[in-house]
Curated annotation (Swiss-Prot):
GO MF annotation terms: toxin activity
Signal peptide residue numbers: 1-20
Tissue expression remark: Expressed by the venom gland.
Phylogenetic classification of the source organism: Eukaryota, Metazoa, Ecdysozoa, Arthropoda, Chelicerata
Entry comment on modification after translation: Contains 4 disulfide bonds.
Stated name of the protein: U8-lycotoxin-Ls1b
Length: 77
């Protein structure tokens, strides 16, 4: 009887550890993916870079994308 209880507790502990590990290892967002709602989820070599959208001088929104760290993007005419 003690062996059955011990086995049950060990299995419960193993399942709990597996679930906790899976929750901590969320998939990161790859390059050029939208990160407006999740700025901390970009992969390690990327940063969530945000840009304001303007129309006639008034701000109408914000876009955020996972981009390479240290890279500067410029608008082309």
């Amino acid at each position: 009887m003690k062996l059955i209880i011990f086995t049950g507790l060990v299995l419960f502990a193993i399942v709990s550890l597996i679930e906790a590990q899976a929750e901590n290892e969320k998939a990161c967002l790859p390059q050029y993916q939208v990160c407006t709602d999740a700025p901390g989820n970009c992969c390690s070599n990327l940063v969530c870079d945000c840009y304001g959208r303007y129309k006639s001088g008034a701000r109408i929104g914000r876009n955020c994308f996972c981009l390479q760290k240290g890279v500067i993007y410029k608008r082309e005419n």
